[in-house]
Amino acid sequence: MAGLNTVRERLPKGRGHDLTTWTAGQLTSFLTGLRGDRLEVPVLVAATTGMRRGEVLGLRWSDLDLDAGRLAVRQALSAPRDPDTGQHLPVFGEPKTRRGKRSVPRPAQTVAALRGHRKAQATARLQVGPDYQDHGLVFAEPDGFPIHPDRFRERFEYRVARSGLPRVRFHDLRHTYATLALQAGVHAKVVSGILGHANIGITLDIYSHAIPAMEESAAETIAALVFGGS
């Protein structure tokens, strides 16, 4: 599909699929189409922080410092299969890696969206009344319960299909964030820390497709320093 960035890399174990990302323009187009939708703010958070789906769904308001423009990743929501019942029930657990617990910066646009979302959530809570189950979650069902990861995935895939954009998974927003950051010249160690990777080597291995653009940017930067405007 035209405009889709599909990169075949030797990914870490368990990640043998093609690495798929959107361009900045495609991401902007999708976010614009989500305005007013329940997915708008969680997608914006993922797209501007590189957080995993479970980390986004596990966010609590106590993890956010809106004045400082940062959030703390402390837990993740998943839905593993119960061996006794065969059901996939939402459970909270530790982030995926040892360095998964981290502090993540957020741009002003995301902070503003979260402030608006908090007000809307408070209004919805009053409408539900005493039946509202307060788990302190940033993103929850209308009754306050955690959003099932599979249901969230289905909603996201539905909106992507309707958008006319190349098909991506929610996790590909994380890949898109990292790729755009590296191509913009953000140091790989900084990106690695924001993503919660165990080490910078993992970041460079996964996103090696971004290195040529980084090298070109470095060359232009050095040339500007040496030769100035001449």
Write out the residue ranges for each language-model feature.
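Short, charged phosphate-coordinating catalytic segments
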Residues: 1-2, 25-27, 44-77, 81-83, ...
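C-terminal secondary-structure termini that scaffold catalytic or DNA-interacting sites
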Residues: 3-9, 14-21, 32, 68, ...
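A generic structural signal for short hydrophobic patches within well-formed alpha-helices
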Residues: 27, 111-114
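Short, basic (Lys/Arg/His-rich) helix/loop patches that form interaction surfaces
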Residues: 28-41, 49, 104, 120-130, ...
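A broad detector of short, well-ordered amphipathic alpha-helices
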Residues: 40, 44, 176-179, 201, ...
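A short, basic/aromatic helix-end/turn motif that makes direct DNA contacts
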Residues: 58-64, 192-198, 208
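Arg/Lys-rich amphipathic alpha helix in sigma70-family domain 2
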Residues: 115-119
